[in-house]
Amino acid sequence: MPKVAVGGTFQYLHDGHARLIEKAFEIAGSGKVYIGLTSDEMLQKNHSVESYKIRRSRLLEYIKKMGVPEEKYEVTRLNDPCGPTIEEDFDHIIVSPETYPVALKINTIREKKGKKPLEIVYVEYVMAEDGIPISSTRISKGEIDRHGRLKKEA
């Protein structure tokens, strides 16, 4: 049974996050998805980010709405970019263009430790109406909504 890792801050849970999470469950099939959620301590953002507790609650609510049984996933706190993927056995890691370099680093470290590399599943950005990627930063600036629709200027 595949063991799949995906991680992020998951602020606003926008359509880009949804695509990553959906891909993780698709790849896992009958296996399990481990979602690393960035801890408050690890955050280094230029905009305010809600607490780990709030982001975790929203993430769990989103997955529940997807209809995924609780035994098919686990949400863990990420205190560093690699999380448990260095030491634990995983088969796949789901990444965006932003997190792809972290997956390469994880595989380099795993190989040095004699562990098999993770299969990297690359998921392209979801574009907003203006052709620029949806991001939590853009949402917090009021440029777009969670679905990439441009906000009307007042």
Swiss-Prot record:
An annotated GO BP: coenzyme A biosynthetic process
Top-level EC class as recorded in UniProt: transferase
Keywords: ATP-binding, Coenzyme A biosynthesis, Cytoplasm, Nucleotide-binding, Nucleotidyltransferase, Transferase
Gene3D superfamilies per the UniProt record, alphabetical: HUPs
Domain of life: Archaea
EC number(s) given by UniProt: 2.7.7.3
InterPro entries noted in UniProt: Cyt_trans-like (IPR004821), PPAT_arch (IPR023540), Rossmann-like_a/b/a_fold (IPR014729)
Catalytic reaction(s) noted: (R)-4'-phosphopantetheine + ATP + H(+) = 3'-dephospho-CoA + diphosphate
Job of this protein: Reversibly transfers an adenylyl group from ATP to 4'-phosphopantetheine, yielding dephospho-CoA (dPCoA) and pyrophosphate.
Name used for this protein in its record: Phosphopantetheine adenylyltransferase
Name of the gene: coaD
